[in-house]
Amino acid sequence: MTDGVWWFFLFWAPAYFSDQYGYESDSPMAIALIFTLYAIVTILSIGGGYLPTYFVDKKGMNPYIGRMRAMLIFACFPLLGLFAQPMGAFSPWWPAIIIGLLGAGHQAWSANLYSTIGDMFPKSTIATITGIGAMAGGIGSFLINKGSGLLFTYAEGQGSAFSFMGFDGKPAGYMIVFCICALAYLVGWIIMKALVPKYKPIIVDLTL
């Protein structure tokens, strides 16, 4: 679910700045915006490994509980995506900064998500579980990117007849996808918490 958000911004960010502001991907302004976006992601995502360590070492939490609490905090970062399109009316730098913060939240979330596998599953199964998760993430990424493209094409064709939260046409399509991306992490966290409400190591019988 959440991998698709990351790949959406990887794939569509240049097109977004081109569609909304007319900056071609190879223009100096577009390059500056994309550079800023990923600089924010790179610098801030480093803190993704520190927060759960703080909860475990300083607060004495169980590793799973500390990691889940950290992931809940990281899941709130993407909520900033709700403001990317509205703030973009003032300057293209706002979406670049907001998407960068969202991306940093994703990287921190993703690092801890994969670490929960090591917390719960035996070492002999970690590679398999990680591979299955990566495959599911790839499928989700394909679906959100393909679906977004279809939505943008449809919204652009409808023009002012297609509206959402004060935006018409293709901008309305972007606003819809930004809303989905913003909420995906909290939904993912709730699903994880519902499936695994308490820490319980999973034992696999390899004698069968």
Model-derived regions, located:
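Transmembrane alpha-helical cores of Major Facilitator Superfamily
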Residues: 35-39, 100, 131-139
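A membrane-interface helix-boundary motif in multi-pass transporters
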Residues: 63-69, 150-183
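Multi-pass alpha-helical transporter architecture, strongest
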Residues: 79-88, 174-208
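Extracytoplasmic gate region of multi-pass secondary transporters
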Residues: 1-49, 106-110, 114, 141-149
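A late C-terminal transmembrane helix in Major Facilitator Superfamily
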Residues: 118-157
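Helix-to-loop junctions at the C-terminal end of transmembrane segments
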Residues: 45-63, 152-153
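Loop-to-transmembrane helix entry
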Residues: 22-40, 66-67, 93-97, 128, ...
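C-terminal transmembrane helical hairpin of 12-TM major facilitator-type secondary transporters
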Residues: 64-113
